[in-house]
Amino acid sequence: MKELIISLLLWIGAETNYNVDLAHPEIKMMSQTALEHKFYGHKKPANGTLHAFYDPKTDIIYLNENFDRFNAFHKGVLLHELLHYVQDLNDVVGKKFQCMRETELEVYPLQKKYLLEVHGVVFEYDELYVLLQANCNPNMF
């Protein structure tokens, strides 16, 4: 996992202006049920679509225990969360973005670029959904 994190951080450094000379984040693997409970708590029913998340309060990346470091999609998921970690440690919230949710507007296109350029995988995502999720006032809709 260490080598994968190093290679992903190097890619992030080459594609962005962020400082990536950072301590590696702690990675915790957990079951799908535990992952969703940790992220959603009791607020939302689990639906099995959460792959991972970054907790900016603890600087921990939580991954599904079925993470496969040889799977391109899984590498893209880890890249996505590492981007949030790098953004957080580069203090982009309040400078480049109004809130942490808004950082998704940068992360999804970079994840798409990484998967296509490095793995030849076309990653499609719903840009409108991401735009809505990136809203700093989630109760607006």
Task: Provide a role label for each language-model segment.
Residues 62-78:
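Short pre-active-site segment immediately N-terminal to the catalytic Zn-binding motif
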Residues 63-64, 87-98:
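Substrate-binding clefts and substrate-entry loops adjacent to catalytic sites
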Residues 97-132:
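Post-HExxH zinc-binding segment in Zn-dependent metallohydrolases
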Residues 69-71, 83-86, 96-97:
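Mature extracytoplasmic domains of secretory-pathway proteins
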Residues 1-61, 71, 117:
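Auxiliary, metal-adjacent structural segments of Zn-dependent hydrolase domains
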Residues 49, 89-90, 100-103:
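Acidic/His-rich structured neighborhood in mature extracellular/periplasmic domains
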Residues 4, 8, 74, 78, ...:
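Stable alpha-helical elements in mature extracytoplasmic
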Residues 76-89:
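Active-site recognition of the HExxH zinc-binding catalytic motif
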